[in-house]
Amino acid sequence: MKFFIDTADIEEIRAANELKILDGVTTNPTLIAKTGKPFMDVVKEILAEVPDKPVSLEVASTDYEGMIREGEMLAQLGKNVVIKIPMTIDGLKAVKYFEYNGIKTNVTLIFSPAQALLAMKAGASYISPFVGRLDDISHTGMELISQIKTIIDNYGFSSQIIVASIRNPMHVLEAALIGAHISTIPYKVIAQLVKHPLTDLGIERFLKDWESVPEKPF
């Protein structure tokens, strides 16, 4: 499974990149707004940090012409830019346009297997089903991931699943067990994946025992 980080915070991206496990970045208007910085400043910082990894940048328009205009502008910022497009009728048309012209797309805000199927039929490079938001309304987000994976296995679609709206380490583990291609993870959840209470206890015990070793070389 590939690990993307879901943030526009350059410090979080750098920290994740230093772990040598980062495979890409996803952003959205909300995450960029949280930085309090101008849009282009944020984007250029991110692209400079991960020039060889896919970075999803979302269009702000909801109409076809606007999506094309904004997507083409964003695509010029780097070869690793992926145009993030909402799951709408106009969005599907835009996906077809971009993919035909060699620009990768990520269809976002997917909440049903039917939406995922349409996005894959349109040729999306990536599809982003939101598990946490489904869990919030008493649906089972991971069931959606399993259904999408089955559709891909049945028909051989090339689209990759980006499990989005991840809230906790279990979401990542469940996505991996299902066979999703990618999880896009907030930095705080990446940090949580590292930790286990028995690991902490083991380190504490080893350090205590080490103190009793005579003539330590270091």
Curated annotation (Swiss-Prot):
Judging by the UniProt lineage, the source's domain of life is Bacteria
Enzyme Commission identifier(s)? 2.2.1.2
> Which key words are in the record?
Cytoplasm, Pentose shunt, Schiff base, Transferase
What stretch or stretches form a coiled coil here?
none
Q: What is its main location?
A: cytoplasm
Q: Which family does it belong to?
A: Belongs to the transaldolase family. Type 3B subfamily.
- State what protein this is by name: Probable transaldolase
Q: Which gene encodes it?
A: tal
